[in-house]
Protein backbone atom coordinates (compact mmCIF):
# COMPACT_ATOMS: atom_id res chain seq x y z
CA UNK A 1 0.00 0.00 0.00
CA UNK A 2 2.83 2.33 0.79
CA UNK A 3 6.06 2.99 -1.08
CA UNK A 4 7.95 3.55 2.15
CA UNK A 5 7.06 4.84 5.55
CA UNK A 6 10.26 6.33 6.88
CA UNK A 7 12.98 7.21 4.42
CA UNK A 8 15.87 9.57 4.08
CA UNK A 9 14.80 13.18 4.01
CA UNK A 10 12.68 13.60 0.88
CA UNK A 11 13.34 17.29 0.57
CA UNK A 12 16.97 17.79 1.58
CA UNK A 13 17.66 21.50 1.61
CA UNK A 14 20.50 22.56 -0.65
CA UNK A 15 22.42 25.80 -0.54
CA UNK A 16 20.95 27.08 -3.80
CA UNK A 17 17.34 26.09 -3.53
CA UNK A 18 14.29 27.35 -1.70
CA UNK A 19 11.35 25.00 -1.17
CA UNK A 20 7.65 25.15 -1.74
CA UNK A 21 4.96 23.07 -0.06
CA UNK A 22 2.64 21.50 -2.58
CA UNK A 23 0.41 18.48 -2.83
CA UNK A 24 2.32 16.03 -4.93
CA UNK A 25 5.59 14.14 -4.77
CA UNK A 26 9.18 15.25 -5.03
CA UNK A 27 10.04 13.09 -8.05
CA UNK A 28 8.36 12.45 -11.36
CA UNK A 29 8.02 8.73 -10.76
CA UNK A 30 5.74 9.18 -7.76
CA UNK A 31 2.00 9.43 -8.09
CA UNK A 32 0.70 13.02 -7.98
CA UNK A 33 -1.37 13.48 -4.83
CA UNK A 34 -3.45 16.18 -6.47
CA UNK A 35 -5.24 13.38 -8.31
CA UNK A 36 -6.12 11.71 -5.01
CA UNK A 37 -8.36 13.98 -2.99
CA UNK A 38 -7.93 12.14 0.29
CA UNK A 39 -4.26 11.24 -0.02
CA UNK A 40 -2.03 11.83 2.96
CA UNK A 41 0.16 14.86 2.27
CA UNK A 42 3.53 13.99 3.79
CA UNK A 43 5.72 15.61 1.13
CA UNK A 44 7.07 18.77 2.66
CA UNK A 45 8.91 20.78 0.05
CA UNK A 46 9.73 21.29 -3.59
CA UNK A 47 12.42 23.61 -4.99
CA UNK A 48 11.41 27.04 -6.22
CA UNK A 49 12.57 27.88 -9.70
CA UNK A 50 14.22 31.06 -8.39
CA UNK A 51 14.30 33.61 -5.60
CA UNK A 52 11.83 35.64 -7.67
CA UNK A 53 9.19 32.97 -7.00
CA UNK A 54 9.65 33.55 -3.28
CA UNK A 55 9.40 37.30 -3.74
CA UNK A 56 6.10 36.77 -5.55
CA UNK A 57 4.78 34.82 -2.59
CA UNK A 58 5.81 37.61 -0.23
CA UNK A 59 4.11 40.24 -2.37
CA UNK A 60 0.98 38.11 -2.47
CA UNK A 61 0.75 38.21 1.31
CA UNK A 62 3.01 35.39 2.45
CA UNK A 63 4.42 35.76 5.96
CA UNK A 64 8.11 35.46 6.80
CA UNK A 65 8.54 33.67 10.11
CA UNK A 66 11.27 32.17 12.25
CA UNK A 67 12.11 28.49 11.88
CA UNK A 68 11.24 27.99 15.59
CA UNK A 69 7.55 28.17 14.67
CA UNK A 70 7.71 24.82 12.87
CA UNK A 71 5.65 22.11 14.53
CA UNK A 72 7.34 19.34 16.55
CA UNK A 73 6.00 16.70 14.14
CA UNK A 74 7.34 18.51 11.05
CA UNK A 75 10.64 16.60 10.94
CA UNK A 76 8.84 13.27 11.27
CA UNK A 77 6.49 14.15 8.41
CA UNK A 78 9.40 15.43 6.33
CA UNK A 79 11.18 12.09 6.66
CA UNK A 80 8.25 10.25 5.13
CA UNK A 81 7.22 9.50 1.59
CA UNK A 82 3.60 9.77 0.56
CA UNK A 83 1.03 7.25 1.67
CA UNK A 84 -2.04 6.08 -0.14
CA UNK A 85 -5.34 7.32 1.31
CA UNK A 86 -6.86 5.29 4.11
CA UNK A 87 -9.71 3.00 3.19
CA UNK A 88 -12.81 3.32 5.41
CA UNK A 89 -11.90 0.01 7.07
CA UNK A 90 -8.33 1.14 7.78
CA UNK A 91 -9.47 4.50 9.14
CA UNK A 92 -12.01 2.81 11.40
CA UNK A 93 -9.31 0.46 12.70
CA UNK A 94 -6.96 3.38 13.42
CA UNK A 95 -9.66 5.39 15.18
CA UNK A 96 -10.65 2.48 17.40
CA UNK A 97 -7.00 1.89 18.26
CA UNK A 98 -6.71 5.52 19.35
CA UNK A 99 -10.02 5.37 21.21
CA UNK A 100 -9.16 2.23 23.14
CA UNK A 101 -5.55 2.98 24.05
CA UNK A 102 -5.76 6.69 24.75
CA UNK A 103 -9.20 6.80 26.33
CA UNK A 104 -8.38 3.88 28.63
CA UNK A 105 -5.08 5.43 29.69
CA UNK A 106 -6.36 8.99 30.01
CA UNK A 107 -9.61 7.82 31.55
CA UNK A 108 -7.90 5.81 34.27
CA UNK A 109 -5.54 8.70 35.02
CA UNK A 110 -8.50 11.09 35.18
CA UNK A 111 -10.42 8.76 37.49
CA UNK A 112 -7.49 8.48 39.91
CA UNK A 113 -6.98 12.24 39.70
CA UNK A 114 -10.50 12.94 40.91
CA UNK A 115 -10.42 10.17 43.50
CA UNK A 116 -7.25 11.85 44.76
CA UNK A 117 -9.10 15.15 45.05
CA UNK A 118 -11.98 13.46 46.85
CA UNK A 119 -9.90 11.48 49.36
CA UNK A 120 -10.64 14.09 52.02
CA UNK A 121 -14.37 13.91 51.30
CA UNK A 122 -14.47 10.12 51.71
CA UNK A 123 -12.27 10.39 54.79
CA UNK A 124 -14.97 12.44 56.53
CA UNK A 125 -17.19 9.36 56.73
CA UNK A 126 -14.25 7.08 57.61
CA UNK A 127 -13.28 8.78 60.87
CA UNK A 128 -11.05 11.69 59.79
CA UNK A 129 -12.87 14.35 61.85
CA UNK A 130 -12.43 12.44 65.11
CA UNK A 131 -8.82 11.36 64.52
CA UNK A 132 -7.46 14.71 63.36
CA UNK A 133 -9.84 16.87 65.42
CA UNK A 134 -11.13 19.23 62.75
CA UNK A 135 -14.47 21.04 62.38
CA UNK A 136 -16.67 21.37 59.29
CA UNK A 137 -15.42 24.93 58.71
CA UNK A 138 -11.81 23.73 58.90
CA UNK A 139 -12.73 21.00 56.42
CA UNK A 140 -13.98 23.73 54.06
CA UNK A 141 -10.71 25.62 54.56
CA UNK A 142 -8.77 22.50 53.54
CA UNK A 143 -10.75 22.33 50.29
CA UNK A 144 -9.97 26.01 49.71
CA UNK A 145 -6.25 25.45 50.35
CA UNK A 146 -6.19 22.62 47.81
CA UNK A 147 -7.20 25.14 45.14
CA UNK A 148 -4.78 27.78 46.41
CA UNK A 149 -2.06 25.24 45.61
CA UNK A 150 -3.87 24.47 42.35
CA UNK A 151 -3.73 28.08 41.15
CA UNK A 152 -0.11 28.59 42.29
CA UNK A 153 0.93 25.48 40.37
CA UNK A 154 -0.66 26.59 37.08
CA UNK A 155 2.05 29.02 35.97
CA UNK A 156 5.23 26.97 36.54
CA UNK A 157 3.39 23.79 35.56
CA UNK A 158 2.27 25.08 32.17
CA UNK A 159 5.73 26.42 31.38
CA UNK A 160 7.41 23.11 32.26
CA UNK A 161 4.72 21.21 30.36
CA UNK A 162 5.54 23.12 27.16
CA UNK A 163 9.32 22.96 27.42
CA UNK A 164 9.83 19.33 28.58
CA UNK A 165 8.66 16.00 27.09
CA UNK A 166 4.99 15.68 27.95
CA UNK A 167 5.08 11.98 28.83
CA UNK A 168 7.91 12.35 31.33
CA UNK A 169 6.20 15.40 32.83
CA UNK A 170 2.94 13.51 33.37
CA UNK A 171 4.72 10.48 34.84
CA UNK A 172 6.80 12.49 37.33
CA UNK A 173 3.88 14.67 38.42
CA UNK A 174 1.72 11.58 38.99
CA UNK A 175 4.50 10.04 41.09
CA UNK A 176 4.73 13.21 43.22
CA UNK A 177 0.98 13.23 43.72
CA UNK A 178 0.99 9.58 44.86
CA UNK A 179 3.66 10.33 47.48
CA UNK A 180 1.61 13.22 48.88
CA UNK A 181 -1.49 11.02 49.14
CA UNK A 182 0.58 8.48 51.10
CA UNK A 183 1.80 11.23 53.44
CA UNK A 184 -1.80 12.03 54.43
CA UNK A 185 -1.55 8.94 56.66
CA UNK A 186 1.04 10.77 58.77
CA UNK A 187 -1.18 13.78 59.46
CA UNK A 188 -2.35 14.02 63.03
CA UNK A 189 -3.60 17.62 63.19
CA UNK A 190 -5.13 20.43 61.17
CA UNK A 191 -1.74 22.04 60.41
CA UNK A 192 -0.40 18.90 58.79
CA UNK A 193 -3.44 18.61 56.54
CA UNK A 194 -3.07 22.27 55.52
CA UNK A 195 0.39 21.62 54.04
CA UNK A 196 -0.60 18.33 52.41
CA UNK A 197 -3.73 19.70 50.72
CA UNK A 198 -1.83 22.72 49.40
CA UNK A 199 0.92 20.60 47.84
CA UNK A 200 -1.57 18.04 46.51
CA UNK A 201 -3.35 20.85 44.66
CA UNK A 202 0.00 22.17 43.42
CA UNK A 203 1.09 18.83 41.95
CA UNK A 204 -2.28 17.96 40.39
CA UNK A 205 -2.81 21.40 38.85
CA UNK A 206 -1.47 20.74 35.34
CA UNK A 207 -2.45 17.11 34.81
CA UNK A 208 -5.86 17.95 33.40
CA UNK A 209 -4.47 20.53 30.90
CA UNK A 210 -1.85 17.94 29.89
CA UNK A 211 -4.56 15.36 29.18
CA UNK A 212 -6.58 17.90 27.19
CA UNK A 213 -3.47 18.78 25.17
CA UNK A 214 -2.98 15.09 24.39
CA UNK A 215 -6.59 14.77 23.23
CA UNK A 216 -6.00 17.69 20.87
CA UNK A 217 -2.91 16.02 19.37
CA UNK A 218 -4.57 12.72 18.49
CA UNK A 219 -8.20 13.52 17.64
CA UNK A 220 -9.99 15.75 15.14
CA UNK A 221 -12.17 18.65 16.29
CA UNK A 222 -15.38 16.67 15.79
CA UNK A 223 -13.96 13.65 17.64
CA UNK A 224 -12.75 15.81 20.51
CA UNK A 225 -16.23 17.22 20.98
CA UNK A 226 -18.10 13.93 21.36
CA UNK A 227 -15.21 12.10 23.06
CA UNK A 228 -15.02 14.64 25.88
CA UNK A 229 -18.03 13.16 27.74
CA UNK A 230 -16.65 9.64 27.14
CA UNK A 231 -13.30 10.66 28.58
CA UNK A 232 -14.97 12.32 31.54
CA UNK A 233 -17.07 9.28 32.38
CA UNK A 234 -13.98 8.20 34.29
CA UNK A 235 -14.28 11.27 36.48
CA UNK A 236 -18.05 11.23 36.85
CA UNK A 237 -18.04 7.53 37.67
CA UNK A 238 -15.09 7.69 40.08
CA UNK A 239 -17.60 7.61 42.94
CA UNK A 240 -18.46 4.01 42.03
CA UNK A 241 -15.06 2.37 42.76
CA UNK A 242 -14.25 4.92 45.47
CA UNK A 243 -17.66 4.43 47.05
CA UNK A 244 -17.34 0.66 47.14
CA UNK A 245 -13.81 0.91 48.58
CA UNK A 246 -15.09 3.24 51.29
CA UNK A 247 -18.06 0.94 51.89
CA UNK A 248 -15.76 -2.03 52.41
CA UNK A 249 -13.49 -0.07 54.73
CA UNK A 250 -16.49 0.68 56.96
CA UNK A 251 -16.24 -2.94 58.12
CA UNK A 252 -12.51 -2.79 58.93
CA UNK A 253 -11.80 -3.38 62.63
CA UNK A 254 -7.99 -3.33 62.47
CA UNK A 255 -5.92 -0.88 64.51
CA UNK A 256 -5.20 1.31 61.46
CA UNK A 257 -7.92 3.89 60.78
CA UNK A 258 -10.18 3.25 57.73
CA UNK A 259 -9.48 6.70 56.28
CA UNK A 260 -5.74 5.95 56.35
CA UNK A 261 -6.34 2.66 54.53
CA UNK A 262 -8.29 4.62 51.91
CA UNK A 263 -5.25 6.88 51.41
CA UNK A 264 -2.91 3.87 51.17
CA UNK A 265 -5.07 2.12 48.56
CA UNK A 266 -5.52 5.18 46.33
CA UNK A 267 -1.89 6.26 46.76
CA UNK A 268 -0.64 2.77 45.91
CA UNK A 269 -2.68 2.54 42.72
CA UNK A 270 -1.48 6.00 41.69
CA UNK A 271 2.15 5.05 42.36
CA UNK A 272 2.06 2.08 39.97
CA UNK A 273 0.17 4.19 37.43
CA UNK A 274 2.96 6.80 37.50
CA UNK A 275 5.55 4.17 36.51
CA UNK A 276 3.47 3.11 33.51
CA UNK A 277 2.86 6.72 32.44
CA UNK A 278 6.55 7.64 32.63
CA UNK A 279 7.39 5.07 29.96
CA UNK A 280 4.22 4.92 27.85
CA UNK A 281 2.49 8.32 27.94
CA UNK A 282 3.05 9.81 24.44
CA UNK A 283 4.67 13.23 23.99
CA UNK A 284 2.84 13.61 20.65
CA UNK A 285 1.68 11.26 17.84
CA UNK A 286 5.17 10.94 16.36
CA UNK A 287 6.40 9.58 19.73
CA UNK A 288 3.46 7.26 20.43
CA UNK A 289 4.89 3.79 21.14
CA UNK A 290 1.56 2.07 20.57
CA UNK A 291 1.36 3.26 16.93
CA UNK A 292 3.31 2.04 13.92
CA UNK A 293 5.19 4.64 11.87
CA UNK A 294 2.47 4.46 9.26
CA UNK A 295 -0.26 5.01 11.85
CA UNK A 296 1.63 7.97 13.29
CA UNK A 297 1.65 9.65 9.88
CA UNK A 298 -2.05 9.06 9.34
CA UNK A 299 -2.87 10.32 12.84
CA UNK A 300 -0.91 13.55 12.36
CA UNK A 301 -2.44 14.07 8.93
CA UNK A 302 -6.01 13.55 10.18
CA UNK A 303 -5.57 16.06 13.00
CA UNK A 304 -3.84 18.78 11.02
CA UNK A 305 -6.44 18.57 8.24
CA UNK A 306 -9.19 18.94 10.83
CA UNK A 307 -7.66 21.68 12.97
CA UNK A 308 -5.67 23.32 10.15
CA UNK A 309 -3.03 23.98 12.78
CA UNK A 310 0.07 22.43 14.31
CA UNK A 311 0.30 19.56 16.80
CA UNK A 312 2.94 20.63 19.34
CA UNK A 313 5.77 23.13 19.76
CA UNK A 314 8.28 23.25 22.64
CA UNK A 315 9.25 26.93 22.40
CA UNK A 316 7.41 29.51 24.51
CA UNK A 317 6.28 32.41 22.31
CA UNK A 318 5.64 35.74 23.98
CA UNK A 319 3.48 37.07 21.15
CA UNK A 320 1.15 34.06 21.41
CA UNK A 321 0.89 34.56 25.17
CA UNK A 322 -0.03 38.23 24.65
CA UNK A 323 -2.51 37.37 21.89
CA UNK A 324 -4.25 34.90 24.20
CA UNK A 325 -4.62 37.60 26.86
CA UNK A 326 -5.98 40.10 24.32
CA UNK A 327 -8.48 37.65 22.80
CA UNK A 328 -11.95 38.24 24.33
CA UNK A 329 -12.76 34.55 23.87
CA UNK A 330 -10.06 33.69 26.42
CA UNK A 331 -11.69 35.92 29.02
CA UNK A 332 -15.19 34.69 28.27
CA UNK A 333 -14.13 31.08 28.85
CA UNK A 334 -12.17 32.09 31.97
CA UNK A 335 -15.15 33.97 33.40
CA UNK A 336 -17.48 31.08 32.54
CA UNK A 337 -15.15 28.64 34.32
CA UNK A 338 -15.26 30.90 37.37
CA UNK A 339 -19.04 31.29 37.48
CA UNK A 340 -19.76 27.61 36.81
CA UNK A 341 -17.29 26.29 39.37
CA UNK A 342 -18.83 28.33 42.18
CA UNK A 343 -21.09 25.28 42.40
CA UNK A 344 -18.29 22.71 42.39
CA UNK A 345 -18.03 22.38 46.16
CA UNK A 346 -21.42 20.67 46.10
CA UNK A 347 -19.50 17.46 45.32
CA UNK A 348 -17.47 17.83 48.52
CA UNK A 349 -20.50 18.71 50.67
CA UNK A 350 -22.69 15.81 49.60
CA UNK A 351 -21.49 13.35 52.22
CA UNK A 352 -22.06 15.96 54.94
CA UNK A 353 -25.55 16.70 53.59
CA UNK A 354 -26.31 12.97 53.54
CA UNK A 355 -25.40 12.86 57.23
CA UNK A 356 -27.64 15.87 57.92
CA UNK A 357 -30.48 13.96 56.27
CA UNK A 358 -29.87 11.15 58.78
CA UNK A 359 -28.31 8.87 56.18
CA UNK A 360 -25.78 6.62 57.90
CA UNK A 361 -22.09 6.70 56.95
CA UNK A 362 -22.50 3.24 55.46
CA UNK A 363 -25.49 4.21 53.34
CA UNK A 364 -23.86 7.51 52.36
CA UNK A 365 -21.28 5.57 50.37
CA UNK A 366 -24.07 3.75 48.50
CA UNK A 367 -25.90 7.00 47.74
CA UNK A 368 -22.60 8.29 46.37
CA UNK A 369 -22.41 5.25 44.09
CA UNK A 370 -25.94 5.99 42.83
CA UNK A 371 -24.93 9.60 42.17
CA UNK A 372 -21.90 8.46 40.16
CA UNK A 373 -24.10 6.06 38.19
CA UNK A 374 -26.51 8.87 37.32
CA UNK A 375 -23.64 11.11 36.18
CA UNK A 376 -22.25 8.30 34.04
CA UNK A 377 -25.59 7.83 32.26
CA UNK A 378 -25.78 11.60 31.67
CA UNK A 379 -22.30 11.56 30.12
CA UNK A 380 -23.26 8.70 27.78
CA UNK A 381 -26.38 10.59 26.67
CA UNK A 382 -24.30 13.74 26.11
CA UNK A 383 -21.82 11.75 24.02
CA UNK A 384 -24.48 10.45 21.65
CA UNK A 385 -26.12 13.88 21.45
CA UNK A 386 -22.86 15.59 20.50
CA UNK A 387 -22.07 12.86 17.97
CA UNK A 388 -25.49 13.16 16.31
CA UNK A 389 -25.61 16.97 16.50
CA UNK A 390 -21.99 18.13 15.95
CA UNK A 391 -20.53 21.64 16.06
CA UNK A 392 -23.11 22.88 18.56
CA UNK A 393 -21.04 22.86 21.75
CA UNK A 394 -22.57 26.06 23.11
CA UNK A 395 -26.11 24.74 22.87
CA UNK A 396 -25.16 21.36 24.34
CA UNK A 397 -23.48 23.13 27.27
CA UNK A 398 -26.55 25.30 27.81
CA UNK A 399 -28.91 22.32 27.73
CA UNK A 400 -27.19 20.52 30.61
CA UNK A 401 -27.76 23.52 32.85
CA UNK A 402 -31.50 22.82 32.85
CA UNK A 403 -31.41 19.73 35.12
CA UNK A 404 -29.14 21.58 37.56
CA UNK A 405 -31.44 24.59 37.75
CA UNK A 406 -34.46 22.33 38.17
CA UNK A 407 -32.79 20.17 40.81
CA UNK A 408 -31.43 23.17 42.71
CA UNK A 409 -34.77 24.95 42.92
CA UNK A 410 -36.51 21.72 43.96
CA UNK A 411 -33.92 21.03 46.68
CA UNK A 412 -34.50 24.46 48.21
CA UNK A 413 -38.29 24.28 47.85
CA UNK A 414 -38.92 20.77 49.21
CA UNK A 415 -39.43 20.33 52.96
CA UNK A 416 -36.39 18.98 54.81
CA UNK A 417 -38.46 16.08 56.05
CA UNK A 418 -38.78 14.78 52.47
CA UNK A 419 -35.48 12.90 52.64
CA UNK A 420 -35.89 10.91 49.41
CA UNK A 421 -36.91 14.02 47.49
CA UNK A 422 -33.93 15.98 48.77
CA UNK A 423 -31.50 13.20 47.86
CA UNK A 424 -33.02 12.83 44.37
CA UNK A 425 -32.99 16.56 43.58
CA UNK A 426 -29.39 16.93 44.77
CA UNK A 427 -28.36 14.11 42.44
CA UNK A 428 -30.18 15.76 39.51
CA UNK A 429 -28.49 19.08 40.27
CA UNK A 430 -25.07 17.51 39.68
CA UNK A 431 -25.54 17.55 35.89
CA UNK A 432 -23.66 20.87 35.68
CA UNK A 433 -20.55 18.69 35.43
CA UNK A 434 -21.50 17.82 31.83
CA UNK A 435 -21.46 21.52 30.95
CA UNK A 436 -17.98 21.87 32.44
CA UNK A 437 -16.77 18.90 30.39
CA UNK A 438 -18.10 20.36 27.13
CA UNK A 439 -16.71 23.81 27.91
CA UNK A 440 -13.22 22.53 28.73
CA UNK A 441 -12.91 20.77 25.38
CA UNK A 442 -14.41 23.73 23.51
CA UNK A 443 -11.98 26.12 25.21
CA UNK A 444 -8.86 24.50 23.75
CA UNK A 445 -10.45 23.58 20.41
CA UNK A 446 -11.15 27.25 19.59
CA UNK A 447 -7.49 28.26 19.57
CA UNK A 448 -4.30 27.22 17.80
CA UNK A 449 -0.69 28.02 18.46
CA UNK A 450 0.73 25.81 21.20
CA UNK A 451 1.63 28.66 23.56
CA UNK A 452 -1.72 30.36 23.01
CA UNK A 453 -3.60 27.10 23.50
CA UNK A 454 -1.77 26.41 26.77
CA UNK A 455 -2.25 30.02 27.90
CA UNK A 456 -5.98 29.81 27.29
CA UNK A 457 -6.09 26.52 29.15
CA UNK A 458 -4.10 28.12 31.98
CA UNK A 459 -6.55 31.04 32.19
CA UNK A 460 -9.49 28.63 32.20
CA UNK A 461 -7.92 26.70 35.07
CA UNK A 462 -7.19 29.94 36.95
CA UNK A 463 -10.89 30.83 36.75
CA UNK A 464 -11.70 27.29 37.82
CA UNK A 465 -9.29 27.45 40.77
CA UNK A 466 -10.37 30.88 42.02
CA UNK A 467 -13.99 29.72 42.05
CA UNK A 468 -13.01 26.60 43.95
CA UNK A 469 -11.15 28.73 46.50
CA UNK A 470 -14.34 30.72 47.08
CA UNK A 471 -16.99 28.00 46.83
CA UNK A 472 -16.11 26.08 50.04
CA UNK A 473 -16.58 29.31 51.99
CA UNK A 474 -20.18 29.53 50.78
CA UNK A 475 -21.00 26.48 52.89
CA UNK A 476 -20.75 27.87 56.41
CA UNK A 477 -21.85 25.74 59.35
CA UNK A 478 -24.14 28.52 60.56
CA UNK A 479 -26.28 27.98 57.41
CA UNK A 480 -26.67 24.22 57.99
CA UNK A 481 -28.53 22.11 57.12
CA UNK A 482 -30.23 23.92 54.20
CA UNK A 483 -27.33 26.19 53.18
CA UNK A 484 -29.61 28.63 51.39
CA UNK A 485 -26.88 31.20 50.51
CA UNK A 486 -24.79 28.53 48.77
CA UNK A 487 -27.76 27.24 46.78
CA UNK A 488 -28.76 30.76 45.69
CA UNK A 489 -25.26 31.44 44.34
CA UNK A 490 -25.26 28.09 42.54
CA UNK A 491 -28.65 28.54 40.90
CA UNK A 492 -28.34 32.21 39.92
CA UNK A 493 -24.64 32.69 39.13
CA UNK A 494 -23.33 29.21 38.26
CA UNK A 495 -26.27 27.70 36.44
CA UNK A 496 -28.06 30.72 34.93
CA UNK A 497 -25.31 33.24 34.11
CA UNK A 498 -22.79 30.72 32.71
CA UNK A 499 -24.92 29.61 29.70
CA UNK A 500 -25.32 33.27 28.69
CA UNK A 501 -21.52 33.62 28.57
CA UNK A 502 -21.25 30.58 26.29
CA UNK A 503 -23.88 32.05 23.98
CA UNK A 504 -21.90 35.30 23.69
CA UNK A 505 -18.74 33.32 22.87
CA UNK A 506 -20.59 31.41 20.16
CA UNK A 507 -21.83 34.63 18.54
CA UNK A 508 -18.28 36.04 18.38
CA UNK A 509 -16.81 32.83 16.96
CA UNK A 510 -19.59 32.50 14.38
CA UNK A 511 -18.91 36.06 13.23
CA UNK A 512 -15.20 35.27 12.83
CA UNK A 513 -16.04 32.19 10.76
CA UNK A 514 -18.29 34.26 8.51
CA UNK A 515 -15.53 36.82 7.93
CA UNK A 516 -13.02 34.06 7.11
CA UNK A 517 -15.37 32.41 4.67
CA UNK A 518 -15.87 35.72 2.89
CA UNK A 519 -12.09 36.22 2.73
CA UNK A 520 -11.55 32.69 1.43
CA UNK A 521 -14.20 33.14 -1.27
CA UNK A 522 -12.50 36.37 -2.30
CA UNK A 523 -9.08 34.71 -2.51
CA UNK A 524 -10.51 31.84 -4.56
CA UNK A 525 -12.00 34.34 -7.00
CA UNK A 526 -8.64 36.12 -7.25
CA UNK A 527 -6.76 32.84 -7.66
CA UNK A 528 -4.63 33.57 -4.60
CA UNK A 529 -5.97 31.06 -2.06
CA UNK A 530 -2.41 29.93 -1.30
CA UNK A 531 -1.69 33.21 0.52
CA UNK A 532 -3.95 32.21 3.43
CA UNK A 533 -3.09 28.50 3.38
CA UNK A 534 0.73 28.62 3.34
CA UNK A 535 3.60 30.55 4.88
CA UNK A 536 7.25 30.72 3.85
CA UNK A 537 9.95 30.21 6.46
CA UNK A 538 13.52 31.48 6.54
CA UNK A 539 15.84 28.70 7.69
CA UNK A 540 19.29 27.27 6.98
CA UNK A 541 20.43 24.03 5.42
CA UNK A 542 22.91 21.51 6.85
CA UNK A 543 25.81 23.68 5.62
CA UNK A 544 24.51 26.83 7.31
CA UNK A 545 23.33 28.49 4.09
CA UNK A 546 20.07 30.52 4.24
CA UNK A 547 17.14 28.97 2.43
CA UNK A 548 13.43 29.77 2.14
CA UNK A 549 10.74 27.14 2.59
CA UNK A 550 7.02 27.55 1.89
CA UNK A 551 5.08 25.44 4.37
CA UNK A 552 1.43 24.60 4.80
CA UNK A 553 0.00 26.46 7.80
CA UNK A 554 -1.11 23.18 9.35
CA UNK A 555 2.57 22.28 9.84
CA UNK A 556 3.36 25.55 11.61
CA UNK A 557 2.76 26.74 15.14
CA UNK A 558 0.47 29.62 14.14
CA UNK A 559 -2.32 31.02 16.28
CA UNK A 560 -5.93 31.04 15.13
CA UNK A 561 -5.57 34.79 14.48
CA UNK A 562 -2.48 34.27 12.31
CA UNK A 563 -3.88 31.28 10.42
CA UNK A 564 -6.89 32.66 8.57
CA UNK A 565 -7.58 29.19 7.21
CA UNK A 566 -8.60 28.02 10.71
CA UNK A 567 -12.33 27.51 11.26
CA UNK A 568 -13.65 27.85 14.81
CA UNK A 569 -15.75 24.95 16.12
CA UNK A 570 -19.03 26.22 17.50
Swiss-Prot record:
Sample GO molecular function, one term = cysteine transmembrane transporter activity
Instruction: Tell me where it resides.
Output: Endoplasmic reticulum; Membrane
Phosphoserine found at? 14
Q: From start to end residue, where is composition biased (Low complexity)?
A: 1-15
Q: Which organism is it from?
A: Schizosaccharomyces pombe (strain 972 / ATCC 24843)
Q: Which Pfam families match?
A: MFS_1
Which positions make up the signal peptide?
none
Keyword annotations from UniProtKB, A to Z: Endoplasmic reticulum, Membrane, Phosphoprotein, Transmembrane, Transmembrane helix, Transport
The protein depicted here goes by the name Uncharacterized transporter PB1C11.03
Q: Which family does it belong to?
A: Belongs to the major facilitator superfamily. Allantoate permease family.
Region Disordered, residue ranges? 1-34
Mind telling me which residue stretches traverse the membrane in this protein?
96-116, 141-161, 163-183, 198-218, 229-249, 261-281, 328-348, 369-389, 397-417, 423-443, 457-477, 485-505
- Would you tell me the Gene Ontology cellular component terms? endoplasmic reticulum; membrane; plasma membrane
So which domain of life are we looking at?
Eukaryota
Q: Which InterPro entries match?
A: MFS, MFS_trans_sf
Please report the record's description of how this protein sits within the membrane. Answer: Multi-pass membrane protein
Query: One biological process GO term for this chain?
Result: cysteine transport
Q: Which residues form a coiled coil?
A: none
Amino acid sequence: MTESIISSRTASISSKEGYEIRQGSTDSSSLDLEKKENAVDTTIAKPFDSDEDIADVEKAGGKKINNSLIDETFAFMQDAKKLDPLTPKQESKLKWKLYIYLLLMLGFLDMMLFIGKATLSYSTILGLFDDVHITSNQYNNLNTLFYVGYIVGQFPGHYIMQTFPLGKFVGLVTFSWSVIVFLHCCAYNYGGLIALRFFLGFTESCLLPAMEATMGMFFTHQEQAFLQPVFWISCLSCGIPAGFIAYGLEFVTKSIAPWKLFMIITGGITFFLSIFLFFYYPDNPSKARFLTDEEKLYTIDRVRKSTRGGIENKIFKKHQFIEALKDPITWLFTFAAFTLMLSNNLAYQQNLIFTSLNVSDLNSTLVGVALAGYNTVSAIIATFAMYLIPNQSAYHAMFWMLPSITGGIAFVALPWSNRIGELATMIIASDFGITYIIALGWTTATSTGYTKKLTRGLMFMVGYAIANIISPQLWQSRDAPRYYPAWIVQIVVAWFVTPIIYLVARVILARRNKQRKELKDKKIAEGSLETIEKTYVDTVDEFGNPVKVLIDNSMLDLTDMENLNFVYPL
